Amino acid sequence: MPSVSAVILKLAAAALSALLLSGVAANATSRIKDLANIEGVRQNQLIGYGLVVGLNGTGDTLNNIPFTKQSLQAMLERMGVNIRGATIRTGNVAAVMVTGNLPAFATQGTRMDVTVSALGDAKNLQGGTLLVTPLLGADGNVYAVAQGSLAIGGFQAEGEAAKITRGVPTVGRIANGAIIEREIEFALNRLPMVRLALRNADFTTAKRIAAAVNDFLGTKSAEPIDPSTVQLTIPAEFKGNAVAFVTEIEQLQVEPDQAAKIIIDERSGIIVMGRDVRVATVAVAQGNLTVSISESPQVSQPNPLANGRTVVTPNSRIGVTEDGKKLALVKDGVSLQQLVDGLNGLGIGPRDLIGILQAIKAAGAIEADIEVM
């Protein structure tokens, strides 16, 4: 008869196994909330022009940046200080652009974050304060007003013969630095229907979302319009209460589908491949041809009293080396992991892998779309 401790261990192992399996199953599905947005519910970009003051001599050079000088004069005149014709010498002011995103359903009096970026030749915005800056939308209306002290992620220090910079000291952020003054009207509760806009357009995913909604409601209220849009007719029991309807729909679980795709960033050498990438039978060989040229000119210096001249004789050395690589056979239908393991076995780096993947695609042996960024 097994001991009590053995039984407890078996029960614990079974519970852990069930937990792991449930985690795998949960990872296979996602909430509709994570797959799609409600059409019309979005952020709006705001932008404004302003001045940052209080800089420790790291602001704009007024003689080189005329718009900073003009803005400073206009601001002081609005405050009753007339400096027309006077010589202004200060390095504590910088012209900046202020940007931010107006959240959906934002109400008057709430706050939002803003980003402040130098527009002139300011070296550092550290320690600066943004003066009152109206933030405009694309329609030209003022939706928020920003002001506050900047938080800078980088820094710059310099001496007479050296300078060091970390990060970007000419860009800062003000948390909750803008107050919203105008709301954007969006009467969600009065809509007879809402549309779901998929973040990643896909026919299969759109159909699955519609099926999940219809199964939940027991009616044909959802219809996929195209790969990126699912139209939802609000049922009678939710009329005038679209918020409750959307809340219920967002929590439904759907298994998303996606096309096999390979993303390549040639600038950084980053390669990202989806799990559904498959490769047909193909042979791969890769070799690097390196040509190196070194110049070591020889200088003939005559005796100072010989009345001769200095002669420079060029001396070039050219070397060619080629890395011998084996021919690798990639079998039909291999998975992503097998493909990566096989190419790594050839000693291929990320940048060489970019060319190989493009060549395999050109040969018609790779079952995926390649997107080069």
UniProtKB/Swiss-Prot annotation:
A GO BP annotation: bacterial-type flagellum-dependent cell motility
Gene Ontology MF: a single term: structural molecule activity
Chief localisation class: periplasm
Localization annotation: Periplasm; Bacterial flagellum basal body
Keyword Ligase annotated: no
Disulfide bonds: none
Keywords linked to the UniProt accession: Bacterial flagellum, Periplasm, Signal
An annotated GO cellular component: outer membrane-bounded periplasmic space
Signal peptide: 1-28
NCBIfam families xrefs: PRK05303.1
The protein's assembly and partners: The basal body constitutes a major portion of the flagellar organelle and consists of four rings (L,P,S, and M) mounted on a central rod.
Function statement: Assembles around the rod to form the L-ring and probably protects the motor/basal body from shearing forces during rotation.
PANTHER family attached to this UniProt entry: FLAGELLAR P-RING PERIPLASMIC PROTEIN FLGI, FLAGELLAR P-RING PROTEIN
Entry's family note: Belongs to the FlgI family.
Protein's recorded name: Flagellar P-ring protein
